[in-house]
Amino acid sequence: MKNMKIGTVIGLCLLLSFFFGTSAKAESITSPDGQLKLNFSVNAQGEPVYELSYKGKEVIKPSKLGLELKNDPGLMNGFTLIDTKTATFDETWQPVWGEVKSIRNHYNEMAVTLNQKAQGRNLIICFRLYNDGLGFRYEFPQQKNLNYFVIKEEHSQFAMAGDHTAFWIPGDYDTQEYDYTESKLSEIRGLLQGAITPNASQTPFSPTGVQTSLQMKTADGLYINLHEAALIDYSCMHLNLDDQNLVFESWLTPDAKGDKGYMQTPCRSPWRTVIVSDDARDILASKLTLNLNEPCIYEDVSWIKPVKYIGVWWEMITGKGSWSYTDDVYSVKLGQTDYSKTKPNERHSANNDKVKRYIDFASEHGFDQVLVEGWNEGWEDWFGNSKDYVFDFVTPYPDFDVKMLNAYAKEKGVKLMMHHETSASVRNYERHLDKAYQFMIDNGYNAVKSGYVGNIIPRGEHHYGQWMNNHYLYAVEKAAEYKICVNAHEATRPTGLCRTYPNLIGNESARGTEYEAFAGNKPFHTTLLPFTRQIGGPMDYTPGIFDTKLSFLSGDHSFVRTTLAKQLALYVTMYSPLQMAADFPESYERHMDAFQFIKEVAVDWDDSKYLEAEPGDYITVARKAKGTDNWFVGGITDENPRTSAFTLDFLEPGKQYVATLYADGKDADFEKNPTSYQIKKGLVTNKNKMSVKLARSGGFAVSLIEATPADLKTIRKWK
């Protein structure tokens, strides 16, 4: 038996040698703290291979790298290692806006140059190892035998060391708006079809394909996140799982012809990222994605400001109001359809009187802007017709007076936020972009929410292909010429480009609050988004729904699957420099004591502390408001009630703060009694501890405001 075991081991080694070969020269680097180690080699077939470990544990088993080209020999094998360069980099930089005031960018780098002798071509693979993870990318130098080329597929592997627990959504070329599924990797195939729910545009591609950012947890307590950074002039990467061997491989989004990238050297791929830790809080605190992006390209950023806003959007989403002006028209031809001769449907939300009321509410309660969707002609047949000339972005409906409303808003110290729904007719949008942005400037707008609902025109292109990624960035760069900030919905999920282009102030790119009015989001949804979608950048999640039962609707309908207190907590746990109070003014007027937290909470931060975290279960975060000593804490849970316990040791020693706690009531329940909440106030210091009970799908929020002399006399100590 002993000899048989030895023979088996030898046979296994020979088999592994066949697949991964041996390298004439192996290279390695470690992270600055020495906890992460990367090994790189070229095997006997000339294939690049890397592996990654953390504190001695396997994170990525030996995995191959390379690209398959169309009409050219691939960059897959036949390589020899001809040069290795290493470097160390350490800087601290300040984001224009963000979770923290400054970010350390500290890594060890190894760039390997590979020569493919048979084709006379060189390929560089650059690895950067941070304390919190790895980034690697392909670099294609300009050379005689590699000038213009077309990518058929990128074959970057991520070989898992076990059947990890994963939190995933189906791979799709056109939408990320799916509910998350928690399962073992080996279970994805059996669950994926059931996880594909209807959407306005969707193209799933594989029975084991999933999207990034993919969060996983290993049996021995490692948290592993796979994503990409600096997605520029390239197709979005998905992951396709070989579930027999538990190996993920990159799967790029194709164009209308099925090609996955048109390249001209010198050029490079986005970074492929692996964030890893044995503490879930480190995944949330990681700045690896931002660090792998280039610095801000704008010299003047004074015009880029975080925003807290309200708007008429929730009326339309819930069906209480309408984007369209009339029911008389079923086929619109811009410039020919005469809306003055049609009968208003009386449900059009973007009308003068209603918008003025929202402006008044914003002014009274300190909001910066009011978003108005449905203001412009064309909504009567905007969707489902693959219509090219669907909007012109400058012509308002008869009941929306652009100049009057913007003047009224200016008097009140408020701005209107523009809305550009493209109906995915991207060619039409680009034709009108300069005119649309100039119209904004002429009328006092400085921010726009753009949308890409439906199948892309040019027909056959996908939301996440190279062509569309170039469009999204073009719209952002063009907006900067007019000093306009962009909040892009239905666009590619972020990859940290907001560092380079900070006027990209928001993205949706996931299943947001709107789905609470359609089919509902799972209670654990917002405990996952910071681990997944938000790894690449902030999300315009649009929280703040107080009337969670949607009591104004009749009959059977969806409801918001959280407590009211959890809605408050989301302003802290779901980071964004663009935060909406999405509910109706009258909903807030019924709960003005709870609404106080939304009014006070900041949207830009000097510091953030992740106090508690477990993907799919709970998150507790403390953040320090930009330029102040005030802190805000938010905590949320999934469908399971829990008790959150934390200390206030992040507060400045020697100072006293007024703590106001907004928590679930004793009888709170997201299904039975979601609006039950309690408010408690007291004086605290950095030595205080807090223990808060959270209901099912519940939450809590705390404001910690530096105490005034009057506060010290009138407010009791925290008990």
Short names for language-model regions:
Residues 681-719:
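C-terminal beta-strand-rich structural cap/linker in extracellular carbohydrate-active enzymes
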